[in-house]
């Protein structure tokens, strides 16, 4: 059992039949009362983020999550297909579970697949990925007063705002958490 007082980001646990990973945890003590713990946690089955409240002495069941390194092969209308490069086994994951992640996946991208007792929960991407710009409108001359941005399209068809100097065929670094421009790749 895990004491909720020991919550910190990255800890996985089971509660009410769901599997969560702690994103943030705050501890507060009120006068003579017991300490309270509020945890911002992501439900690994649904992808939803919720705030859970516990009293100081509560304990939760740990969830032992297995992570497997896999390569993205391709996707169709309903699934994505991944291959384990160590034994060449393939798995499929429902496209709805990885909708956001698809914005950053290109062929042969390496991902971590999170599994709980042979149930595939989701995939974990690196914090940042390098993607090629496939469409970028020309910079408008004279529009340089207040950090001008323009919308570009990446090789995965994801659109985001970038600085004006980004051109077609440039490779840029994108945050997989926020979907924002991080910098230009070297």
From Swiss-Prot:
Major location (coarse): cytoplasm
InterPro entries assigned: Elong-fact-P_C, NA-bd_OB-fold, Rib_uL2_dom2, Transl_elong_fac_P/YeiP, Transl_elong_KOW-like, Transl_elong_P/YeiP_cen, Transl_elongation_fac_P, Translation_prot_SH3-like_sf
UniProt cross-references to Pfam families, sorted A to Z: EFP (PF01132), EFP_N (PF08207), Elong-fact-P_C (PF09285)
PANTHER family: ELONGATION FACTOR P (PTHR30053), ELONGATION FACTOR P (EF-P) FAMILY PROTEIN (PTHR30053:SF12)
GO cellular component: cytoplasm
Family, per entry: Belongs to the elongation factor P family.
Superkingdom classification of source: Bacteria
Cell compartment(s), UniProt: Cytoplasm
Listed name of the protein: Elongation factor P
GO molecular function per UniProt: translation elongation factor activity
Record key words, sorted: Cytoplasm, Elongation factor, Protein biosynthesis
Pathway(s) it belongs to: Protein biosynthesis; polypeptide chain elongation
SUPFAM superfamilies: Nucleic acid-binding proteins, Translation proteins SH3-like domain
One GO term of the biological process aspect: peptide biosynthetic process
SMART domains in the record: EFP, Elong-fact-P_C
Job description of the protein: Involved in peptide bond synthesis. Stimulates efficient translation and peptide-bond synthesis on native or reconstituted 70S ribosomes in vitro. Probably functions indirectly by altering the affinity of the ribosome for aminoacyl-tRNA, thus increasing their reactivity as acceptors for peptidyl transferase.
């Amino acid at each position: 059992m895990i004491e909720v007082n020991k919550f910190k980001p990255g800890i996985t646990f089971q509660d009410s039949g769901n599997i969560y990973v702690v994103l943030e945890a705050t501890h507060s003590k009120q006068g003579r009362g017991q300490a309270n713990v509020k945890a911002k946690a992501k439900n690994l089955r649904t992808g939803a983020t919720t705030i859970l409240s516990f009293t100081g002495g509560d304990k939760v069941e740990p969830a032992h999550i297995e992570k497997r390194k896999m390569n993205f092969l391709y996707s169709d209308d309903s699934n994505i297909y991944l291959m384990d490069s160590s034994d060449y086994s393939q798995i499929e994951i429902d496209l709805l579970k990885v909708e956001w992640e698809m914005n950053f996946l290109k062929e042969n991208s390496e991902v971590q697949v999170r599994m709980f007792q042979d149930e595939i929960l989701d995939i974990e991407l690196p914090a940042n990925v390098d993607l090629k710009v496939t469409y970028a409108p020309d910079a408008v001359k004279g529009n340089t007063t207040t950090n001008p941005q323009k919308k570009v399209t990446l090789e995965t068809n994801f659109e985001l705002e970038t600085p004006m100097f980004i051109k077609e065929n440039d490779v840029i670094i994108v945050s997989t958490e926020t979907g924002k421009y991080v910098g230009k790749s070297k």
